[in-house]
Amino acid sequence: MTELKTITGEQDSVQSSIVLEDAPTVSILHVEDDETVASVAREILEAQGWRVETCVDGSTALEKISGEVEYDLLLIDDDLPGVNGLQLITHARELDHRCATPMVVLAANPIEAEAREAGADVFLRKPQGIGMLTETINRLLGERQQEME
């Protein structure tokens, strides 16, 4: 399992991602019940040319994670109605088609250890972590691509 990274500070430099015209669009499932956080994250991620699908509760997210739609990354809050984010990650890690998918926990509560135990690759603390999304996702996707080569 990949070592969990915790990022809680502000970043001074601006990060950007390279989107190649022939490259497939990155697809992200974002599970977040706070409309403001979901909107800000969507704006940041879509500015990179990435496709974002948002779920507002854990039960709907559980169905999507269990389904066959391909996601390049799961971005999950912990405090959700229905199934919590750590339960979603634990479930996803048990699925053949999701076990290698990069997973990021973006949460307000200090649950780094619990996120590690559940199988998260990275823990980002709200609100500071929102500014680290692009850099973090680029790094995780780059690491996954190297593993696949």
List the model feature ranges, each with a label.
Residues 76-77:
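Active-site residues of response regulator receiver
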Residues 87, 108-126, 131-135:
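Alpha4 helix (beta4-alpha4-beta5 surface) of REC/receiver domains from two-component response regulators
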Residues 54-73:
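Acidic, metal-coordinating helix/loop segments flanking the phosphotransfer/catalytic sites
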Residues 35-53:
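Two-component/phosphorelay signaling modules centered on CheY-like receiver
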Residues 57, 84-87:
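Acidic catalytic/metal-coordinating carboxylates
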Residues 1-29, 129-149:
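Non-catalytic signal-transmission and effector/linker regions of two-component phosphorelay proteins
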Residues 86-99:
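Short amphipathic alpha-helix used as the core "switch/output" element in two-component signaling
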Residues 32, 107:
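Conserved acidic carboxylate
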